[in-house]
């Protein structure tokens, strides 16, 4: 039993993380690393992100408007060219006009599909941005290595019972002298 306890203690001691040697100034000055980040820097970061988002949104709406204008101009240009050409048979004229109309409708449909996809992408981006955390996170000596939290928890929880029982004293009833029962170890 003692050998088992000894081996467990040795295993825990060997598995214990080494102290961080890269940043000795953090170990010497733990109060500096746990200082709260000023609110102004967070607001500046969020304002910068909002400005970038607005600029991107404006660029994308301009691109959509440009493509919409180009598609309508293509349809308008295609119709006069069709009229100017002299085609002898009326069946060819009707087939060309139907093709031009179908092309314009298909182009408008594609533009609507692009707008819908763009709107869905914007909604997805806004949802992602609402879940983005501020990149300024506090660093302290325990956060330098993530496995150190297992050994050094920051909040000690109240434990209502002792984690280890006293092995040296056996557990017995008050009147154990009168009973012929073996003691529990």
UniProtKB/Swiss-Prot annotation:
Residues 1-15 form the signal peptide. PANTHER family: ALPHA-S1-CASEIN (PTHR10240:SF0). Its main location: secreted. Not glycosylated. GO terms for cellular component: extracellular region; extracellular space. GO terms for biological process: response to 11-deoxycorticosterone; response to dehydroepiandrosterone; response to estradiol; response to progesterone. This is Alpha-S1-casein. It is found in: Secreted. Belongs to the alpha-casein family. Heteromultimers of alpha-s1 casein and kappa-casein; disulfide-linked. Keywords: Disulfide bond, Milk protein, Phosphoprotein, Secreted, Signal. The modification Phosphoserine is found at residues 31, 33, 41, 71, 85-86, 88-91. In milk, the alpha s1- and beta-caseins precipitate in presence of calcium (so-called calcium-sensitive caseins). Kappa-casein prevents the precipitation of the other caseins by calcium through the formation of large stable colloidal particles termed micelles. Mammary gland specific. Secreted in milk. It comes from Homo sapiens (Human). PROSITE patterns: CASEIN_ALPHA_BETA. It comes from the Eukaryota. Important role in the capacity of milk to transport calcium phosphate. Casoxin D acts as opioid antagonist and has vasorelaxing activity mediated by bradykinin B1 receptors. The lineage of its organism: Eukaryota, Metazoa, Chordata, Craniata, Vertebrata.
């Amino acid at each position: 039993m003692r050998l088992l306890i000894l081996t467990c203690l040795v295993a825990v001691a060997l598995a214990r993380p080494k102290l961080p040697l890269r940043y000795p100034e953090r170990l010497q000055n733990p109060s500096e690393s746990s200082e709260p980040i000023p609110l102004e820097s967070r607001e500046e970061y969020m304002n910068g992100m909002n400005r970038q988002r607005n600029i991107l949104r404006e660029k994308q709406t301009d691109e959509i408007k440009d493509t919409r204008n180009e598609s309508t101009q293509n349809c308008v240009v295609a119709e006069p060219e069709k009229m100017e050409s002299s085609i002898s048979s009326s069946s060819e004229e009707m087939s060309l006009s139907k093709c031009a109309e179908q092309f314009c409708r298909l182009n408008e449909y594609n533009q609507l599909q692009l707008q819908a996809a763009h709107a869905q992408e914007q909604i997805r981006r806004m949802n992602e941005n609402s879940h983005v955390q501020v990149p300024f996170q506090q660093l302290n000596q325990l956060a330098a290595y993530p496995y150190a939290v297992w050994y050094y928890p920051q909040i000690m929880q109240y434990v209502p019972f002792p984690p280890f029982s006293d092995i040296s004293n056996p557990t017995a009833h008050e009147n154990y002298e009168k009973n012929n029962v073996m003691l529990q170890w």
